[in-house]
Amino acid sequence: LDVELDYFYKLTDNMLFSRAVAPSLGYGSLPVNDAKMENQGVEFTFKAHLVDTRNVKLDLRLNGAHYKNKMIEMPVDYYNADGTAVRQQMNGAMAVGHSMYDHYTYVYGGVDENTGDALYQAYYDSRYGGLGDDKGNNEYNYITSLHQWILDQEEAGVENPERFLCDTMFADMGYATLQYVNKSYLPDLNGGVGIDLDVYGLTLSVACSYQIGGYGYDYTYLSLM
């Protein structure tokens, strides 16, 4: 039995991003090298010599890898007049402490029993009123991006802003809240398995791949709904 086990760590910096610039320059953005991201994981390979005779050899191969990805520094959004850099808080689904492969999407809440419409989770700030009250609650109270809202509150000095969050279900996706859903495109484990058979000099090899875990998004199915 042959066994190989490897651990890897890679820090990537100077990634390619677009930075917004003044429209007076004649273009809206400028490609820049910025931000930092780390990748780390383990890889393994097993090879078992099941049959090893003069004329017949049979080997079984198995390999796999588990890895994760995380942003540790976001790109600069703009520079203040004194030259200090202000970094982006989010860029799409990317944010510090999260993987660029994390799903940042809406949460499906089932079907409305009365209308048959699909329901989606919507968060709102309880400090500005709830549903049907007299505190001026309206569509502007609903949070479109949950993680961005939390970052904005923390930047404003609000401690534990999550305590002000309330949620409800809406059939109108326009009120739904984008949020991390603890799912990633990255598989928990992926690799391959195969056999090598050698009989009197005639070799037959078979290889297959596998993946365990990882979540995709079916945009074709979405377009049909």
Feature annotation, model-predicted:
Residues 1, 38, 183-191:
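Short, glycine/acidic-rich beta->alpha junctions
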Residues 1-9, 42-50, 56-66, 191-197, ...:
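Membrane-embedded beta-strands that build the outer-membrane beta-barrel scaffold
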Residues 8-50, 150-158, 178-181:
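Outer membrane beta-barrel strand-and-loop segments of large Gram-negative receptors
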Residues 13, 54, 70-72, 203, ...:
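Residue-level signal for secondary-structure boundary sites
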Residues 16-21, 72-77, 217-223:
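Outer-membrane beta-barrel translocator domains and adjoining extracellular loop/strand segments
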Residues 32-35, 51-183, 224-225:
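Conserved small-residue
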Residues 168-170, 185-186, 201-203, 208:
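Segments forming glycine/polar-rich beta-alpha architectures that bind adenosine-containing cofactors
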Residues 204-225:
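C-terminal beta-barrel architecture of Gram-negative outer-membrane proteins
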